[in-house]
Swiss-Prot record:
Lineage of the organism: Bacteria, Pseudomonadati, Spirochaetota, Spirochaetia, Leptospirales
Primary role: Binds directly to 16S ribosomal RNA.
Family note: Belongs to the bacterial ribosomal protein bS20 family.
Basic and acidic residues bias spans: 1-11
GO annotations of cellular component type: cytosol; small ribosomal subunit
Alphabetized Pfam families for the sequence: Ribosomal_S20p
Protein's organism: Leptospira borgpetersenii serovar Hardjo-bovis (strain L550)
Span list, region Disordered: 1-29, 69-90
Protein name: Small ribosomal subunit protein bS20
Annotated keywords: Ribonucleoprotein, Ribosomal protein, RNA-binding, rRNA-binding
Protein's gene: rpsT
Length: 90
């Protein structure tokens, strides 16, 4: 346990940040799973609506350094490729 006030504050701040980051990371994973489910069910309209939200989440995560910006770009690109394959087939 920390004995210095600033260290105690650092611990509190770290807990808050960790909780927020965990929540946002979970939201990203959940959104990706929803899109993949819509793609699997061959529902391009629902998948596209979810994809727009997903890209927004990814951009926000990259902006706040939750994930690297190139990681976000790669995830968007791969998901778009899957979405385009379903849209072309439909």
């Amino acid at each position: 346990m920390a004995n210095i006030k600033s260290s105690e504050k650092d611990i509190r701040r770290t807990k808050r940040r960790n909780a927020a980051n965990s929540q946002n990371r979970s939201r990203l994973r959940t959104q990706a799973k929803k899109i993949l489910k819509a793609i699997k069910e061959k529902d391009p309209k629902a998948a596209m609506a979810l994809f727009i939200e997903y890209t927004s989440f990814l951009d926000k995560a990259a902006k706040t350094n939750l994930i690297h910006s190139k990681n976000a770009d790669r995830k968007k690109s791969r998901m778009a490729k899957r979405l385009n394959a379903v849209s072309a087939a439909a």
